[in-house]
Amino acid sequence: MRITNVRFIKGRSKMEKLKKRWNKVTVLLLTFGIVFGLFGAMPVQAQDGNASGSTIFDVKIVHTNDIHARVEEDDYNQVIGMDRLSGIAQTFTEGADGSLMLDSGDTFHGQPIATLVKGESVAKLMKACGYDAMTTGNHDWSYGKERLKELGGIANVKILSGNIKNADGTSFFDTDELVKEITKNGKTLKIGVFGVSDPEMKNKTTPSNVEGLDFQDAVAYAKREAATLKAEGCDVVIALSHTLDPKM
């Protein structure tokens, strides 16, 4: 699990950024005219007016990846479990102006507690934790493409892998993005989230699980989607990705 505290100052005309490292760090992609990396907690200052009119947005992000259905606490293997995760997330985000809970895939498969019910147990726990969005890892396709869609519904989470298309070019999942607006002192901070999955994962699952799907170039899609969200007025763009290539 990774937790990130981000403070956004909205109301002036130049961008500044200050870095503060946490013990646990995460990497997110933010778009403010450019795309840059966010490491740990970083106050970001977006300016478009006078300083006296600035509004600070306290946004807290909880991020997980590669859970592999390890939902039960296991101190020996340093697994905190979903129960503790939920409590930590609730405590961490309390009092924030806004929060997001995100996952980068390989979530629904990997332990008997999940495989015996085709991922439903994990999906229900994700719903209880309050996840907002996730992207897919190769193991999430293990129960088949339609079951993966069903699990997203059970979890009440948006599955974002917009570079995965049907044969007719339409997106396989119901939506390509999550947009969250946070309003404070008459100003609104708009956060856009999208997801990409490595095309190589099509070759890392049983062919029937992804039959008829086109896994398009992840980098090209990410560039287009970041530009789209920026054009739609997003102050912040977060990319969720699951890749098999460490150089991607």
Predicted regions and their residues:
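Bacterial Sec-dependent N-terminal signal peptides
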Residues: 2-29
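Sec-dependent N-terminal signal peptides of Gram-positive bacterial secreted proteins and lipoproteins
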Residues: 21-44
